[in-house]
């Protein structure tokens, strides 16, 4: 039926900040949906709290609200805008939960707002464990025996009847939060207790474990006329028991017989029809490898991570079509945008294999619990396309950017057999590499399949890769073996290693003998129909389908998988750069490996290459396309690191030149540049070994900040207070980058701020100065940033602007740069300069209304600031106050300490804007899920050096009616200054310690700082962990607590006797 005309205005809810389990795939889905609705002529109102997304750009919807996704604020916007309908299925779990809450509170009925897409009853049936179970029984679809419980005792009783192992799944949580596998009663008690707390409805499902079955997913679509189809099926390399977001996945499924595929396909279609879902839906099934038995695991009645993967794997734009279906269109009326000639009621066919590998944050969290289970831990993922499994798997391995270029981690060769097999059996994030090592040691696929329940088909492929390695080793320079290796996805670098030569020589040999890749098109129909998608992958074969156009082109390098320190912000800058390239009349080509993002949506650029971001893969595209040049400044450290090898190969780097990039990143050159420009920095030195470092620190004086050069997101950065700690740091952390020295700097405790600047080589535009709430020592990505600055004097701001101009001109910056400053006693020091777009670009672009990445790109392509209508210097300030606040994913990462420091830990960000600082802060805290009631108890556990400052905060908390609790030393200090605090016991002091108070719900906030010995703070770690697990606001920086107090004070009344 045609689209609906009885609705005009539609509100779309976004998914909020990026957390583990809910990443950039929702920016992609939301952006697609908004465009899709506007295309049909509807007025679109968007609400999302995440400024780092394309989705929250002004042009995406008719009205964009960057406000907290909470009942209070969404209700306000609904009342103000009065939309006819609400579309919540594109905002992940956040959007769905918000819709449920609005409905339960009667808001939707009161305002007459209709829900589009999927009815609430269907969301309830899919998400509520009990209703789902009833529906499956009605449809006669098998599900594992299970019981809904609301208490720990009920869980223990049920497990006793079906036997262990069992799986615990809390209701209405995201990415398996709070769930897990339990092998015995002790584990069951622990996991269920935590799961019940995390479930908004205090409900868990206890089910029989079917670990070891094959995990298969079907991505299905249905419309209002009951047309339904399968977009794509996918098979997990890892069997059931590991969250699908943490599994390696292949599409299409590889090991099912036709009968099994039809059986599971029918089950998926009957489920989506029974739920009456209109739009996209994801069905997860478990298949017994030894019989035709299967179970339905779960159904996601919304666009999900898997649908982003399915869209990119097939080219079929699920979110775009889900939005069309939501407004009444049917699949047989909508043209498939990929072919431009077939209708969307056409199941995609693939003539290639897609591999997805998750990207984990354990390079940042050395202490994190790496064992995988039913709770998701990956921050992002990579996808690669090839003509066989070996090719797509090896391309995906080198896309991960974890320092490997093959399915091999060289260090594993030294691991003992026993340790190796333990890691093969107990899956961690790097299990693929352990399994590959076991095969290299002669374990057979049969033996490994027995241990891991990974299908023997995949293990045979790993064996095949190993056989090619041996062939290569035995026949150096042999062209036939070289061809075979390239057909199976081997990199030049791996081949060079096996031949004992260099990658350059292998590349030379390939080019001389015309062994070069061809590019194939992703067209949804296995080339059955003509197609017009400019979406390509490389393979070694016959016919090349990517034809170079006559137009001059520019290649933009994306930022690869999302990880801590390099998030969706860089994708944002990439997409904006492409817009500007097109506006300047060039053809824009994107190269990227991340299936979740907007940049890898083929409709964004003129050509998309879905390829690993390595020198070899980029050069292959350059050889074919012969672009005018390559832009590296928007792809984070990933792209910057490719600048030097590309320039050496004669490629034109557009924007800041490699020599100048080096002057900003190389310590000695940078110091020299600052001296020449007469700009102060904290005194520092470089050291290449332990003795040099100790010597440097003695000369500068403790405390010092130590870090390796050339890293992103403060990896392996630490503040050390004495020589013993420094020596232990040099022993454990220096391997962070072996051929680059370690920097030892004087650590200045002061006010930190940062600036993004855009330069055309003569003039410099400074959109704004962002002031950090946390003092220096907390990574800029983990600090709350305020724009415009609230406490900086006019003189300091002028100095910052002056230093910024000098640096941009002195370092020959063309395009963007980011500078971080620290201010102490009105004196400004430069801490670091990044000659590229930084993670604050989207936030600053939105609050100043300057499309910074577009402006920078236009300058890179030859325009000047004055031509674009911008003045030299600091841009006029906004009258509203805007705050960027970090969001963390600690609930998902056991054993990771939530203490903030110089190493970045946040996964996402939110923004709060209002007329005053206090109101903006309130919104930022609410949006980042830090909700403090107006009364309650706050507990202080404070290091000696901060007790004075904490006393002042405690008095203010007491003034607004909070009860004060404190650990022994802190309580004694408070008492000696006339403030009575209720003492709490030491850790392990059964009922009287902080964790037990937290469990009983007697504490509303914890303020915990750590002194000089950051290492020996096990009690503090337990306190912080208990806060995270029970959702109690935790402040590890007094500045953040002070900001929260400002909010509470502005919202409370002080009662005093006269």
UniProtKB/Swiss-Prot annotation:
Q: Where is this region: Carboxyphosphate synthetic domain?
A: 1-401
Q: Where Mg(2+) 1 is bound, by residue?
A: 284, 298
Answer whether the UniProt record assigns the keyword Nucleotide-binding to this protein: yes
Task: For the region Oligomerization domain, give the residue spans.
Answer: 402-546
Task: Name the residues that bind Mn(2+) 2.
Answer: 298, 300
Question: What are the record's GO terms for cellular component?
Answer: cytoplasm
Residues that bind Mn(2+) 3: 820, 832
Q: Where is this region: Carbamoyl phosphate synthetic domain?
A: 547-929
- What remark does the entry make about the cofactor? Binds 4 Mg(2+) or Mn(2+) ions per subunit.
Q: Where does Mg(2+) 2 bind?
A: 298, 300
* Pfam families to which the protein is assigned, alphabetical: CPSase_L_D2 (PF02786), CPSase_L_D3 (PF02787), MGS (PF02142)
Q: One GO BP annotation here? A: L-arginine biosynthetic process
NCBIfam families on file: CPSaseII_lrg, PRK05294.1, PRK12815.1
Q: What is known of its domains?
A: The large subunit is composed of 2 ATP-grasp domains that are involved in binding the 2 ATP molecules needed for carbamoyl phosphate synthesis. The N-terminal ATP-grasp domain (referred to as the carboxyphosphate synthetic component) catalyzes the ATP-dependent phosphorylation of hydrogencarbonate to carboxyphosphate and the subsequent nucleophilic attack by ammonia to form a carbamate intermediate.
Annotated protein name in UniProt: Carbamoyl phosphate synthase large chain
What is the gene called?
carB
């Amino acid at each position: 039926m045609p689209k609906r005309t009885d609705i005009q205005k539609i509100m779309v809810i976004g998914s909020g900040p990026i957390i583990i389990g809910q990443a950039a795939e929702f920016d992609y889905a939301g952006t697609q949906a908004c465009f899709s609705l506007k295309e049909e002529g509807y007025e679109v109102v968007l609400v999302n709290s995440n400024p780092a997304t394309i989705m929250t750009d002004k042009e995406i919807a008719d009205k964009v609200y960057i406000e907290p996704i909470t009942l209070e604020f969404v209700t306000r916007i609904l009342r103000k805008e009065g939309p006819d309908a609400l579309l919540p299925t594109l905002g992940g779990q956040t959007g769905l939960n918000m819709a449920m809450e609005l409905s339960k509170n009667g808001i939707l009925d009161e305002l007459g707002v209709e829900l589009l897409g999927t009815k609430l009853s269907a969301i309830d049936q899919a998400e509520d464990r009990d209703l789902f179970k009833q529906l499956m029984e009605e449809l006669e679809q098998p599900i594992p025996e299970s019981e809904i419980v609301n208490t720990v005792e009920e869980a223990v009783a049920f497990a006793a009847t079906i036997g262990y192992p069992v799986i615990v799944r809390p209701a209405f949580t995201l990415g398996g939060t709070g769930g897990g596998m339990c092998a015995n009663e002790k584990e069951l008690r622990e996991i269920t207790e935590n799961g019940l707390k995390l479930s908004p409805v205090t409900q868990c499902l206890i089910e029989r474990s079917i670990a070891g079955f094959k995990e298969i997913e079907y991505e299905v679509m249905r419309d209002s006329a009951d047309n339904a189809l399968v977009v794509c099926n996918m098979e997990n390399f890892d069997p059931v028991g590991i969250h699908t977001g943490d599994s390696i996945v292949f599409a299409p499924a590889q090991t099912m017989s036709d009968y099994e595929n039809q059986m599971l396909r029918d089950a998926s279609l009957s489920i989506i029809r029974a739920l009456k879902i209109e739009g996209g839906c994801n069905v997860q099934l478990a298949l017994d490898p030894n019989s035709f038995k299967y179970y339905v695991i779960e159904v996601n009645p919304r666009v999900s991570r898997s649908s982003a993967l399915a869209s990119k794997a097939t080219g079929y734009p699920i979110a775009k079509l889900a939005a069309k279906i939501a407004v009444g269109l049917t699949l047989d009326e909508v043209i498939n945008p990929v072919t431009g000639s077939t209708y969307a009621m056409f199941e995609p066919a693939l003539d290639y294999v897609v591999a997805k590998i998750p990207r984990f944050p354990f390079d940042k969290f050395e202490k994190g619990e790496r064992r995988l289970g039913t709770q998701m831990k990956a921050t992002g993922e990579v996808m690669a396309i090839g003509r066989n499994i070996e090719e797509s798997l090896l391309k995906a391995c080198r896309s991960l950017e974890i320092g490997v270029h093959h399915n091999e981690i060289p260090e594993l060769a030294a691991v003992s057999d026993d340790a190796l097999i333990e890691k093969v059996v107990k899956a961690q994030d790097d299990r693929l590499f352990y399994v590959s090592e076991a095969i290299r040691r002669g374990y057979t696929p049969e033996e490994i399949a027995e241990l891991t329940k990974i299908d023997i088909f995949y293990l045979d492929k790993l064996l095949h890769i190993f056989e090619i390695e041996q062939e290569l080793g035995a026949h150096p320079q042999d062209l036939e073996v070289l061809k075979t290796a390239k057909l199976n996805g081997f990199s030049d670098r791996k081949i060079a290693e096996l031949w004992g030569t260099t990658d350059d020589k292998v590349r030379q040999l390939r080019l001389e003998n015309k062994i070069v890749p061809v590019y194939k098109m992703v067209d949804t129909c296995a080339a059955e129909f003509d197609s017009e998608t400019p979406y390509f992958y490389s393979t070694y074969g016959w016919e090349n389908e990517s034809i170079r156009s006559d137009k001059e082109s520019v290649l933009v390098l994306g930022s690869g998988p999302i990880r801590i320190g390099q998030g969706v912000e860089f994708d944002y800058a990439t997409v904006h750069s492409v817009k500007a390239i097109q506006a300047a009349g060039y053809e824009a080509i994107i190269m990227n490996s991340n299936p979740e993002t907007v940049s890898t949506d083929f409709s964004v650029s003129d050509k998309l290459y879905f390829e690993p971001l390595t020198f070899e893969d980029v050069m292959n595209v350059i050889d074919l396309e012969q672009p005018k040049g390559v832009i590296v400044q928007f792809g984070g450290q990933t792209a910057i690191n490719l600048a030097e090898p590309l320039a050496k190969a004669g490629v034109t780097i557009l924007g800041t030149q490699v020599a100048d990039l080096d002057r900003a990143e190389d310590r000695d050159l940078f110091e020299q540049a600052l001296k020449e420009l007469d700009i102060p920095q904290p005194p520092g030195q470089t050291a290449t070994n332990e003795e040099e470092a100790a010597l440097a620190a003695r000369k500068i004086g403790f405390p010092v900040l130590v870090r390796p050069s050339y890293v992103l997101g403060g990896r392996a950065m630490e503040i050390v207070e004495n020589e013993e700690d420094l020596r232990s740091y040099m022993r454990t952390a220096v391997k962070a980058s072996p051929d680059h020295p370690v920097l030892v700097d004087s650590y200045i405790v002061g006010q930190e701020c940062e600036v993004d600047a855009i330069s055309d080589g003569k003039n410099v535009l400074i959109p704004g100065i962002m002031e950090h709430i946390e003092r220096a020592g907390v990574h800029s990505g983990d600090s709350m940033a305020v724009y415009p600055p609230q406490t900086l004097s006019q003189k300091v701001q002028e100095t910052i602007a002056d230093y910024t101009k000098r640096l941009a001109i002195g370092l020959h910056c063309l395009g963007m740069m980011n500078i971080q400053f620290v201010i102490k006693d009105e004196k400004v020091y430069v801490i670091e300069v990044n000659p590229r777009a930084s993670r604050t670009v989207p936030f600053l672009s939105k609050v100043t209304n300057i499309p910074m990445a577009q402006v920078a790109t236009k300058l890179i392509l030859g325009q000047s600031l004055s031509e674009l209508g911008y003045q030299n210097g600091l841009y006029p300030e906004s009258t509203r106050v805007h705050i960027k606040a970090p969001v963390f994913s600690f609930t998902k990462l056991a054993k990771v300490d939530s203490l903030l420091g110089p190493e970045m830990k946040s996964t996402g960000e939110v923004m709060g804007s209002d007329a005053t600082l206090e109101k903006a802060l309130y919104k930022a805290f609410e949006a980042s899920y830090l909700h403090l009631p107006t009364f309650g108890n706050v507990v202080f556990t404070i290091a000696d050096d901060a007790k004075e400052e904490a006393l002042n905060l405690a008095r203010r908390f007491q003034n607004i009616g909070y009860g004060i609790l404190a650990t022994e030393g802190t309580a004694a200090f408070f008492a000696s200054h006339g403030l009575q605090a209720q003492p709490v016991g030491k850790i392990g002091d059964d009922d009287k310690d902080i964790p037990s108070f937290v469990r009983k719900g007697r504490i509303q906030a914890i303020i915990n700082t750590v002194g000089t010995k950051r290492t020996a703070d096990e009690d503090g770690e337990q306190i912080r962990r208990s806060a995270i697990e029970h959702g109690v606001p935790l402040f590890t920086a007094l500045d953040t607590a002070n900001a929260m107090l400002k909010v509470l004070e502005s919202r409370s009344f002080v009662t005093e006797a006269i």
